[in-house]
C-alpha cells in the first residue's frame, strides 16, 4: 500500500496556498466578527425583549459548485462562496428562539490550481513581499553633514517609537510628540544614577556630556501633561525603578541582541531597562562597533497572499460599518416578526462583494495560458513593490541574501524591472510566511547528500559555497574556494567549519532550469530565453529534445494541469474523456479529462490518457498527457538541423531561411480558437430576434451547414462569409403600410411583419472547423433588465502553418523572423544529401555571447547519429579545456561508428563542407552544422498585420498611434524590419518609413494620386530620417545621397538634404 501524508503546519509549498486561503481566512474572519460585532445584541420591539446571539464560531458557507468544464463557457456566473452569519434570536418573554442566517458577503472560489474565476475568466493572484512592521530596527541619515542615528521600535501599525541620537541630544518621537529620552526614562522609573549603573558606557565622556546638558530632573520641570496622558495609555508609568513589563514584547528574532535580559526570546514582555541597552547600541553604531540593520534582508519580509488580502478587506469592512450592520440586523428581525416570515436567511444591505476589489487590484492578473509552462511561471511570481518604501535602485538590485529564495535572473522587463521577480524552484515557506531554501552541508572537504533547509537569517552565520571545487596539480590551491561570507565574496579555506553548499540549480526559477549550458551564456540572453519559454505555442507534432537538463520531468511535480492518481489501484476503464480507477479499498475514483478547451490566449487545452485498462497505478503517478506534455516530460518544440552562415543576404541579422519541408511535414502547425458570441434580444411581444433556417433571399448552398434551427452543425468546415447562426429581427410594419397590411390579412388571413436579416457570418481570415456550439438561457433578472433571452456561442478551430513573418526561437535567447521559405532542392546539402532545416546568421552568436547554443548543436548532432539523448545538468560548469576535449571525442566517435567521414574535419573541427543546391558546386568555406531545439512563438504574422482606412496620429511626432483599440496603425518591430530588409522589399520599406510614418506631404497627396491613377510623387525627407542623420553626424560620420547618372553629361548628381 502506498500513501502520501503532507504536514501543512510545519512547511508549506506554493501549491498549498489555497489551503491557507480557506483555513486562515475563516480563522481571521471569526476573530474580526467577534471584535467588531460582539457576541450579543439586545432588541426591544412591541414590548418584547429579544437577545440576539452572534454565533461567529458557526459560520456557514455556501458555494456555487461550478465545475471546471463550465467555467470556460459560462461568463455570467462567478464561482463564489457565500458567507452566512448564524444569528440565534431568543424571545425573553416566551423563551422561544429561532436561528436565521444573515448573508454577510461573498468571496471568489480559489481552486487547487491557484486560480480565481471571475466572470468566467481565470485569473491568479501575484504574491507580495511585505515588510514586517514589528521589531527594533537601527538606521541613520545625514542632515547638515551630520550623521544622525535612530532606532525605530514598531509595536504595531499605530504605535511607533523613534529614538534619535544626535551630537548633543537624544530624544524620542511618539507619533507626533517629541520628548527627551532621559526624561522619558525618568517617567519609567530610571534615574541618572540607574543609567550610569546599567549602561556599558558609564565611563564615556559622550554619555556624561549628554546627561549634563539636561536640566534638573524633577516632576515640575519634565512633566508635560499632554504627553504624560498620551504615554500612560500605552505604558505602565512609575517614578520608581520598574523591573516589570511596560509593554508587550516586540516579536523579532533579533531582539535577543537588543534586550537587557538574556532570556528575552523566552520573555513575553518589554522592560524599561531595555531602553538603556538600545541607547548603548546606538553608541556602538556611532563608534563603529556594530552595523545598522539591513532592512533588505528577506528575514524582515513575509509573503502577502490572497488570504491576507481578504482578511484585511473584511476587517476594514466590519470595523467601518459595524454600527450600520447592527441596525441592519435589527431591521431584518423586525421584518421577520412583523410580517411573520418563514424565511431563514436575510441579505445585508451592505452586501460585501470582493469582485469589485479584485477587478481593480493590480495583483489580480489575467492568467497566462499560452502553454502549460507559462501558467506555472505566472503563478510563481512575487512582487517586491511596496507603496511605503521608496522605489529606488536599491530595491531593484539583487541582494546576496536572496540566494536560494528568489531567482537571480528572472524578472520583468521595462519599468517594473526588479520589482516583479520569481521564486526559486525548491523554495519552502514557513508557517509564518517566511522563506526556507535547501542546502548541502560541507564536512571534511566533501558535500553530503542529505538536504536540509535554512532561512536567510541563519544563512549569514554560514560560509556559502557556490561551485564545486576541482582538484589542481598544486595541492595548496585545493583547499581554497570562492565563497560568500557576510554579504561579500572571499576566498576561504574549505576545511573550516560552518560551510554550506547551494546547488546552482536551486538559485534559479523553473524557466532557467530548462536551459542547458546556462553558464556559457550571457545573463541578459538567459533572461530572454526564460521569457520565451512562456511564449511558446503548443503544436500538433511535439518531439522530445535531444539535449535536456533533467528538470523536464521534475517540472510536472509543481503543476496541477495534469491528472495524478490520488490512490494506488487498478485501471478499470479508459476512454478519451474519463479514467476510472478502483483503489485498494474497492472504491471507484473517476478522473475527467479536458477535451478541446480554449485557454485565455485562445490556444488549445487538450488531455489524452497515458494508462491502459488493467494497469496498476501508484499514488502520484501521472495519468494524462496534455498538448505540450508527452511521456511525463515537458515538450515545447522540435529538433531541427541548423546551419549557421550567410545565404544570399536572406538571413540578414536575425532573419531565418526556412526549408519548405518543415511546412509539408507540419512540424510547427498549431491549433487556435475563434469564438463567436450571438445574443438574441426580445424588446417586447412584437419586436424580437429568432434563429431559423428559413432565411429570405438566401441560396441553398449558403445554408448547407445549418441545422433545423439555423445554427451551424458541429464538425462542419466553414469558409469566409459562411453563415454561422441565422438571425432575423421581426418588428411590426410602419403606419404608412397599414392599409396594405389590412388588405393582405383579409385576402390571405396572414399577418405581415418587417423582417431584417442579421445573420452572423465568418469574418475574413477565420475559416476553420466548427468544434462545438453552446446555448445559454439568461435568468429572469438579466432578461428583464437587458432584454436578452438567449446566447449562442460557436467555437471555430483553425490550423496555422508556418509562414513568412512568424517567429521561431531557441532556448538561449536566439530568435528570429522567417524571412524566406525555399524548397529543399535550392538549399545547401552535405555529401550524403542531408539538407538543413533552417539557416541562421552566424554573426548573432559572438555579439550576443550565447555560446551554449553551439554546444547544444554539436552535442545534438552527435546524439542524433548515436541514437542517444544527453542530460546536461545545470551544475555543468567545466573549464573550456574539458568541454573542448569532450566535444572532439564525441564528434570523432560519430565519425568512427557511423562511417560518415565528412562529420569530423581536422582542419576546422565542428564545421562541415556543403554544396550549393542550385549548381552543385562546393562552397568556398565550411559551415557550422548541428541539431538544436526550436519552438514557435505566439507572435505570429496573422496577429501582427491589420489595416485601417483612416486613423489618428500623434501630434508631436506625427507617428501612428499605438494599439488596435485606439485605431492605431501598423507597427513593425526591429526583427520584422530586418526580415523585410533581408527579403529586399524596398517598396514596402519606403511605404513604412515614409507614407505610414511622419511624411506629411506624401501622406496627404497619396489618396488623390491613387484615386486619379497618377504616378506617386517623390517623397520628402522625414523627421525621423533627419534625426538619424544628426545622430550619425554626432559620431563624425557623413552621409551623402546620389541620384542616377545625368544622361547629358554622364555625371552622378548629388541630392541635397535639408537638415
UniProtKB/Swiss-Prot annotation:
One of its GO terms (biological process) is DNA-templated transcription. SUPFAM superfamilies: beta and beta-prime subunits of DNA dependent RNA-polymerase. Gene3D superfamilies: 2.40.50.100, 2.40.50.150, 3.90.1100.10, DNA-directed RNA polymerase, subunit 2, domain 6 (2.40.270.10), RNA polymerase alpha subunit dimerisation domain (3.90.1800.10). It catalyses: RNA(n) + a ribonucleoside 5'-triphosphate = RNA(n+1) + diphosphate. It comes from the Eukaryota. Pfam families: RNA_pol_Rpb2_3 (PF04565), RNA_pol_Rpb2_6 (PF00562), RNA_pol_Rpb2_7 (PF04560). InterPro entries: DNA-dir_RNA_pol_su2, DNA-dir_RNAP_su2_dom, DNA-dir_RNAP_su2_hyb_sf, RNA_pol_Rpb2_3, RNA_pol_Rpb2_7, RNA_pol_RPB2_OB-fold. Its main location: plastid. One of its GO terms (cellular component) is mitochondrion. It is found in: Plastid, Apicoplast. Its EC number is 2.7.7.6. One of its GO terms (molecular function) is ribonucleoside binding. Keywords: Apicoplast, DNA-directed RNA polymerase, Nucleotidyltransferase, Plastid, Transcription, Transferase. In plastids the minimal PEP RNA polymerase catalytic core is composed of four subunits: alpha, beta, beta', and beta''. When a (nuclear-encoded) sigma factor is associated with the core the holoenzyme is formed, which can initiate transcription (Potential). DNA-dependent RNA polymerase catalyzes the transcription of DNA into RNA using the four ribonucleoside triphosphates as substrates. Belongs to the RNA polymerase beta chain family. This is DNA-directed RNA polymerase subunit beta. It comes from Eimeria tenella (Coccidian parasite).
Amino acid at each position: 500500500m502506498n500513501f502520501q501524508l503532507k504536514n501543512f503546519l510545519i512547511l508549506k509549498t506554493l501549491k498549498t496556498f489555497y489551503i491557507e486561503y480557506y483555513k486562515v481566512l475563516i480563522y481571521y474572519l471569526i476573530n474580526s466578527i467577534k471584535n467588531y460585532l460582539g457576541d450579543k445584541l439586545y432588541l426591544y420591539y412591541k414590548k418584547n425583549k429579544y437577545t440576539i446571539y452572534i454565533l461567529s464560531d458557526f459560520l456557514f458557507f455556501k458555494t456555487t459548485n461550478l465545475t471546471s468544464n463550465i467555467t470556460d463557457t459560462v461568463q455570467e456566473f462567478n464561482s463564489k462562496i457565500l458567507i452566512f452569519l448564524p444569528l440565534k434570536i431568543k424571545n425573553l418573554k416566551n423563551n422561544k428562539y429561532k436561528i436565521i442566517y444573515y448573508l454577510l458577503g461573498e468571496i471568489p472560489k480559489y481552486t487547487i490550481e491557484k486560480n480565481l474565476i471571475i466572470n468566467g475568466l481565470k485569473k491568479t493572484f501575484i504574491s507580495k513581499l511585505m515588510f514586517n512592521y514589528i521589531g527594533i530596527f537601527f538606521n541613520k541619515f545625514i542632515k547638515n553633514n551630520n550623521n544622525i542615528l535612530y532606532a525605530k521600535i514598531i509595536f504595531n501599525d499605530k504605535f511607533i517609537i523613534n529614538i534619535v541620537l544626535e551630537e548633543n541630544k537624544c530624544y524620542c518621537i511618539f507619533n507626533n510628540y517629541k520628548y527627551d529620552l532621559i526624561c522619558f526614562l525618568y517617567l519609567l522609573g530610571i534615574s541618572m544614577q540607574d543609567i550610569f549603573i546599567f549602561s556599558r558606557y558609564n565611563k564615556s565622556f559622550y554619555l556624561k556630556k549628554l546627561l549634563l546638558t539636561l536640566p534638573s530632573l524633577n516632576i515640575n520641570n519634565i512633566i508635560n501633561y499632554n504627553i504624560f496622558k498620551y504615554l500612560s495609555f500605552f505604558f505602565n508609568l512609575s517614578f520608581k525603578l520598574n523591573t516589570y513589563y511596560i509593554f508587550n514584547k516586540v516579536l523579532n528574532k533579533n531582539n535577543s541582541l537588543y534586550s537587557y535580559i538574556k532570556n528575552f526570546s523566552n520573555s513575553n514582555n518589554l522592560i524599561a531597562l531595555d531602553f538603556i541597552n538600545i541607547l548603548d547600541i546606538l553608541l556602538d553604531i556611532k563608534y563603529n562597533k556594530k552595523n545598522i540593520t539591513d532592512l533588505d534582508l528577506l528575514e524582515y519580509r513575509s509573503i502577502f497572499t490572497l488570504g491576507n488580502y481578504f482578511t484585511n478587506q473584511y476587517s476594514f469592512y466590519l470595523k467601518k460599518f459595524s454600527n450600520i450592520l447592527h441596525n441592519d440586523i435589527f431591521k431584518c428581525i423586525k421584518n421577520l416578526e412583523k410580517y411573520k416570515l418563514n424565511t431563514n436567511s436575510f441579505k445585508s444591505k451592505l452586501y460585501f462583494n470582493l469582485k469589485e476589489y479584485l477587478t481593480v487590484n493590480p495583483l489580480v492578473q489575467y492568467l497566462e495560458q499560452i502553454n502549460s509552462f507559462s501558467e506555472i511561471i505566472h503563478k510563481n511570481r512575487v512582487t517586491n513593490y511596496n507603496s511605503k518604501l521608496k522605489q529606488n535602485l536599491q530595491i531593484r538590485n539583487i541582494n546576496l541574501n536572496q540566494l536560494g529564495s528568489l531567482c537571480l535572473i528572472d524578472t520583468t522587463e521595462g519599468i517594473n524591472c526588479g520589482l516583479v521577480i520569481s521564486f526559486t524552484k525548491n523554495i519552502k515557506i514557513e508557517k509564518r510566511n517566511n522563506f526556507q531554501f535547501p542546502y548541502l552541508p560541507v564536512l571534511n572537504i566533501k558535500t553530503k547528500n542529505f538536504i536540509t533547509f535554512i532561512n536567510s537569517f541563519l544563512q549569514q552565520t554560514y560560509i556559502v559555497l557556490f561551485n564545486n571545487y576541482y582538484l589542481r596539480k598544486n595541492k595548496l590551491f585545493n583547499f581554497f574556494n570562492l565563497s560568500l561570507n557576510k554579504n561579500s565574496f572571499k576566498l576561504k579555506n574549505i576545511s573550516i567549519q560552518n560551510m554550506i553548499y547551494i546547488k546552482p540549480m536551486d538559485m534559479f526559477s523553473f524557466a532557467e532550469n530548462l536551459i542547458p549550458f546556462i553558464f556559457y551564456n550571457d545573463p541578459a540572453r538567459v533572461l530572454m530565453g526564460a521569457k520565451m519559454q512562456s511564449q511558446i505555442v503548443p503544436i500538433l507534432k511535439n518531439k522530445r529534445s535531444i539535449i535536456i537538463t533533467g528538470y523536464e520531468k521534475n517540472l510536472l511535480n509543481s503543476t496541477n494541469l495534469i491528472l495524478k492518481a490520488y490512490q494506488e489501484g487498478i485501471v478499470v476503464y479508459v476512454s478519451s474523456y474519463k479514467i476510472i480507477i478502483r483503489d485498494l479499498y474497492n472504491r471507484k475514483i473517476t478522473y475527467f479529462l479536458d477535451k478541446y478547451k480554449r485557454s485565455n490566449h485562445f490556444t488549445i487545452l487538450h488531455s489524452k490518457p497515458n494508462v491502459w485498462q488493467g494497469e496498476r497505478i501508484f499514488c502520484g503517478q501521472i495519468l494524462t498527457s496534455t498538448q505540450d506534455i508527452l511521456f511525463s516530460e515537458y515538450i515545447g518544440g522540435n529538433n531541427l538541423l541548423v546551419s549557421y552562415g550567410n545565404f544570399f543576404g536572406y538571413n540578414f541579422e536575425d532573419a531565418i531561411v526556412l526549408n519548405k519541408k518543415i511546412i509539408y511535414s507540419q512540424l510547427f502547425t498549431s491549433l487556435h480558437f475563434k469564438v463567436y458570441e450571438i445574443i438574441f434580444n426580445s424588446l417586447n411581444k412584437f419586436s424580437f430576434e429568432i434563429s431559423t433556417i428559413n432565411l429570405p433571399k438566401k441560396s441553398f448552398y449558403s445554408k448547407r451547414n445549418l441545422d433545423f434551427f439555423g445554427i451551424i452543425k458541429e464538425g462542419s468546415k466553414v469558409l469566409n462569409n459562411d453563415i454561422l447562426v441565422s438571425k432575423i429581427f421581426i418588428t411590426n410594419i410602419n403606419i404608412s403600410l397599414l392599409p396594405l397590411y389590412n388588405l393582405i390579412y383579409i385576402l390571405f388571413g396572414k399577418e405581415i411583419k418587417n423582417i431584417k436579416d442579421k445573420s452572423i457570418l465568418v469574418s475574413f481570415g477565420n475559416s476553420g472547423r466548427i468544434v462545438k456550439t453552446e446555448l445559454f438561457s439568461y435568468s429572469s433578472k438579466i432578461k428583464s433588465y437587458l432584454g436578452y433571452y438567449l446566447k449562442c456561442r460557436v467555437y471555430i478551430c483553425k490550423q496555422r502553418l508556418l509562414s513568412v513573418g512568424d517567429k521561431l526561437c531557441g532556448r538561449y535567447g536566439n530568435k528570429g523572423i522567417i524571412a524566406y521559405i525555399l524548397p529543399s532542392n535550392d538549399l545547401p546539402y552535405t555529401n550524403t544529401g542531408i539538407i538543413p532545416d533552417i539557416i541562421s546568421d552566424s554573426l548573432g552568436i559572438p555579439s550576443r555571447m550565447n555560446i551554449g547554443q553551439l554546444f547544444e548543436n554539436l552535442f545534438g548532432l552527435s546524439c542524433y547519429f548515436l541514437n542517444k539523448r544527453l542530460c546536461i545538468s545545470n551544475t555543468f560548469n567545466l573549464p573550456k579545456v574539458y568541454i573542448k576535449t569532450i566535444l572532439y571525442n564525441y564528434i570523432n566517435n560519430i565519425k568512427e561508428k557511423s562511417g560518415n567521414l565528412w562529420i569530423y574535419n581536422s582542419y576546422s573541427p565542428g564545421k562541415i563542407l556543403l554544396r550549393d543546391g542550385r549548381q552543385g558546386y562546393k562552397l568556398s568555406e565550411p559551415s557550422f552544422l548541428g541539431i538544436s531545439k526550436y519552438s514557435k512563438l505566439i507572435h505570429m504574422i496573422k496577429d501582427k498585420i491589420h489595416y485601417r482606412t483612416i486613423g489618428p496620429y500623434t501630434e508631436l511626432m506625427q507617428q501612428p498611434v499605438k494599439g488596435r483599440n485606439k485605431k492605431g496603425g501598423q507597427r513593425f518591430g526591429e526583427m520584422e524590419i530586418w526580415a523585410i530588409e533581408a527579403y529586399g522589399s524596398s517598396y514596402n520599406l519606403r511605404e513604412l518609413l515614409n507614407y505610414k510614418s511622419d511624411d506629411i506631404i506624401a501622406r496627404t497627396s497619396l489618396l488623390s494620386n491613387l484615386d486619379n491613377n497618377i504616378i506617386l510623387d517623390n517623397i520628402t525627407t522625414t523627421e525621423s530620417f533627419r534625426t538619424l542623420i544628426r545622430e550619425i553626424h554626432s559620431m563624425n560620420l557623413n552621409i551623402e545621397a546620389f541620384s542616377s547618372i545625368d544622361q547629358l553629361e554622364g555625371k552622378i548628381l548629388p541630392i541635397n538634404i535639408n537638415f
